[in-house]
Amino acid sequence: MNPIVKSFEYGQHTVTLETGVIARQANAAVLASMGDTTVLVTVVGKKAEDVGRDFFPLTVNYQEKTYAAGKIPGGFFKREGRPSENETLIARLIDRPIRPLFPNGFKNEVQVIITVVSVDPEINPDVISMIGTSAALSISDLPFNGPLGVARVGYTNGEYVLNPNVSQLAESDLDLVVAGTQGAVLMVESEAASLPEEVMLGGVVYGHDQQQVVINAINELTAEAGKTKWDWTAPAEDTDLVEKIKGLAEAELTNAYQIADKHERRDAVIALKNAAVAKLVEENADVDLREVDKLLGSLEKKVVRSRIISGSPRIDGREPDMVRALNVMAGVLPRTHGSSLFTRGETQALVTCTLGTERDAQKVDSIMGEYTNRFMLHYNFPPYSVGETGMVGSPKRREIGHGKLAWRGINAVMPTAEEFPYSVRVVSEITESNGSSSMASVCGTSLALMDAGVPIKTSVAGIAMGLVKEGDDFVVLSDILGDEDHLGDMDFKVAGTRDGITALQMDIKIEGITKEIMQIALQQAYGARVHILNVMDQAISGHREDISDHAPRITTLKINPEKIRDVIGKGGATIRALTEETGTTIELEDDGTVKIASANGEATKEAIRRIEEITAEVEVGTVYNGKVVRIVDFGAFVTILPGKDGLVHISQIAEERVANVSDYLQVGQEVKVKVMEVDRQGRVRLSMKEAQPKAEAAPAAE
């Protein structure tokens, strides 16, 4: 076994690509390392094409092995299970830029498996996984129009940072991943602290420039280790059939795409396609129906694109920079802590916000370490939202990805734990969909958070942009429909405030998207975003002063850290009794901070009173109402505070001489006692005599 290795410096890390030793039965395999973070990438493609398939079956599986971090999995079975949210997100991140680099018409099944086998907690595996995937596909015998370069870009103190580590990202105002070929950007995924458009665009350009070193290294590896590519050519197009279909359907498609309503338009398109197919079958019973369907789809795309390029109104009659009609409502559900209904054209999101305690926060144990997520955003896309039937169950990859994008858009404006000590869960239910439901979720989330009284820094809105480009002519579209997303050349989602961008996601299907085009798209998106924010402000322009009556109110108090054990009690008995008897949730921190949560104000007051009792210090000279707990020959022990007993000596029970303690006191009897002394060992000396009011002195005789 003779390994072929290429190494290069990338930012502050050394990247190594190695092939020829591991997984030699795959079409290609690369062991890719960035520092101590190492991934094994394998690529396998089926030689035989499934003739009946009308799509490209590419599967990307990204898996993190706990042994990579020197851990044993939790749970009963002690092995890795279903993919985590992070694994799903990284699989999507890898899939998006490589998919358009396979040739049109290629329908052989391809599977890419990325396995994290070693991890440095300071180096995230996502970028090296993408680099390794690009290298494996490039040296494989599969048709692939790569290589693909990848870069992570940070922004600190006004400077871009190439491939920042985890600690540097924590201080950065930007976390941007950009992927592209030598001449074109294909994919951008980012989260930002409300940065201006020019800074975001500069980050994309900077990342694309820096990633050329990756492309050059992969080209060198391919020259040395690359396999001969498959002898694959795209199937020849039947020009006669193309012309027949054009004659049968072009005019009808042009008319159908002037229907504004989505369902009417869809029905019209289906009807005209069925009519065209019937006519072709009548002429030739052996016509390839799959080919006909594909050509009708190509014609449909051409008709819509040519109308947009020629300056005709869009599918629903709008101009390129117009946003669909907006309908915005906050506080639409009576018992939720916060809610909103955001409608933009035929896209609608019902969004709810739920407040919880720190105990409700999501605790994540990943190979990068353990962390707590206080803000959660979940996105659901039920089949009825597009007028279809389908399976309902656990979230799919797309739902997880859209939820994370919306989370990135909002996270920058969320308050800190010190400002707002609640865990927050937002759920976006997409009740209607015709384009850009993830950005509707951003808008709805901003509204629901404010309705719940969450003190977010400012409102956030999102917009999806599209692009149609033919030669040197192009049109940038604001607020794209589902059909425009499918038929266009770019999907460009931007979320942000009036001051800047908080999240940017871009997927480009063609080469030739210049910096100028992206700049125009960002400026057009800014105008649309401000328009949406103005409409949102009419529903609610700032967070409510108080949280919902149905939400748990968190009251914070400080106790002596040495008293924490008293509040917890033996085996947790005291705090368990407190929570059960008052109906509150109580959380203790090591510094003595106590958080009491309850929707019932009286319950909170009772919990505070009892905690103050438990943690109170015994004060000399203070009179307490106590309870006799034990009687001995020389006196009685009396509880004056929870967990605090003192001794009333027999001589301190009454003014007269006491011969038998039991003649004066019984266990369970309540008595007033005065603290006379607390010695160095914490023992408390009490007196019943001194707790009694003194008789007034008799007046002097005249």
Curated annotation (Swiss-Prot):
Cofactor: Mg(2+)
Coiled-coil portions: none
Keyword annotations of the record: Cytoplasm, Magnesium, Metal-binding, Nucleotidyltransferase, RNA-binding, Transferase
Domain S1 motif: 621-689
InterPro entries linked: ExoRNase_PH_dom1, ExoRNase_PH_dom2, ExoRNase_PH_dom2_sf, KH_dom, KH_dom_type_1, KH_dom_type_1_sf, NA-bd_OB-fold, PNPase
Keyword ATP-binding annotated: no
Reaction equations catalysed: RNA(n+1) + phosphate = RNA(n) + a ribonucleoside 5'-diphosphate
Molecular function GO labels: 3'-5'-RNA exonuclease activity; magnesium ion binding; polyribonucleotide nucleotidyltransferase activity; RNA binding
Residue ranges occupied by any KH domain in the UniProt entry: 552-611
Any one of the GO BP annotations: RNA processing
One Gene Ontology cellular component: cytosol
Subcellular compartments: Cytoplasm
EC number: 2.7.7.8
PROSITE patterns: KH_TYPE_1 (PS50084), S1 (PS50126)
Residues reported in the UniProt entry to bind Mg(2+): D485, D491
Biological role: Involved in mRNA degradation. Catalyzes the phosphorolysis of single-stranded polyribonucleotides processively in the 3'- to 5'-direction.
UniProt protein name: Polyribonucleotide nucleotidyltransferase
Organism of provenance: Shewanella woodyi (strain ATCC 51908 / MS32)
Lineage: Bacteria, Pseudomonadati, Pseudomonadota, Gammaproteobacteria, Alteromonadales
Gene name of this polypeptide: pnp
